[in-house]
Amino acid sequence: MLQQYQHILVPVDGSYEAELAFKKAVAVAKRNGPKASVHMVHVVDTRAFQNISSFDTTMVEQVTDTAQKTLDKYVAEAKADGLENVDYSIEYGAPKTIIARDVPKDLGIDLIMIGATGLNAVERLLIGSVTEYVTRMAVCDVLVVRTDLENKPAPKPKKK
């Protein structure tokens, strides 16, 4: 018998891959019944601001404001698609551990649906992939999303 995941976590970072994961999570939750829920999380990596000499709180506030607008849009989209149990949180700290361990333990998450990494090989080598870490260290099942709702490979985003 297939697992009926009831509490799905979707990390949202504004990337196309995260959007694909969100859309698939909504579809899975709707299939799994009225008690199924989607919780999105955006993690503001405060370590990224530590090396900026002119750091002030307005930078974190701007990042938080942008994340909140994106997450509000996703909540509205999910509700318009018929999923009532959808919410989000914005966390501050190290994305890897917050996504893999902290939020799943706190909320009883049974599935993390995360977008495939958007990093290139050099970036993965230097800073490591959040997706890779989550797949190795999560306290629950993890599904890495690489395709759209029709299971077609995601097109490569055009460089600006």
Where are these regions (language model features)?
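Structural beta-alpha unit
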Residues: 1-3, 76-112, 149-160
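Short beta->alpha linker loops
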Residues: 55, 90-94, 117
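Small/aliphatic-rich secondary-structure junction motif
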Residues: 2-53, 81, 160
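General small-molecule cofactor/ligand-binding pocket signal
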Residues: 39-41, 87-91, 143
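Gly/Ser-rich helix-loop-strand patches that form or flank binding pockets
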Residues: 4, 104-153, 159
